[in-house]
């Protein structure tokens, strides 16, 4: 049985000077799934050690909410694109 998923945000990531790609920010309790389906990002995730965060291309969800894990609290979540944490992509 596949783990349930939960979309916590939608973000735009610059792909080039011409356009941006839309991604859904997802939380899953399956590390392998996060590595395979999405793009691992550097995060500061204090609310729950059980969740892994990844970005899935918007087309992966086919316009519907992406499936997800037990409902982790995202009260103290920061998402970064860069390893030096210079750019806060999304903060909840």
Description of each model-found segment:
Residues 2-92:
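Repetitive, compositionally biased segments used for assembly/scaffolding
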């Amino acid at each position: 049985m596949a783990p349930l998923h939960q979309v916590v945000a939608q973000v735009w990531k610059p792909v080039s000077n011409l356009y941006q790609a839309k991604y859904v920010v997802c939380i899953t309790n399956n590390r392998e799934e996060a590595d395979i389906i999405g793009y691992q990002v550097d995060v500061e995730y204090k609310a729950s050690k059980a969740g892994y965060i990844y970005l899935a291309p918007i087309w992966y969800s086919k316009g519907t909410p992406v499936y997800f894990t037990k409902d982790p609290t995202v009260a103290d979540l920061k998402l970064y694109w860069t390893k030096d944490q210079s750019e806060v992509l999304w903060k909840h």
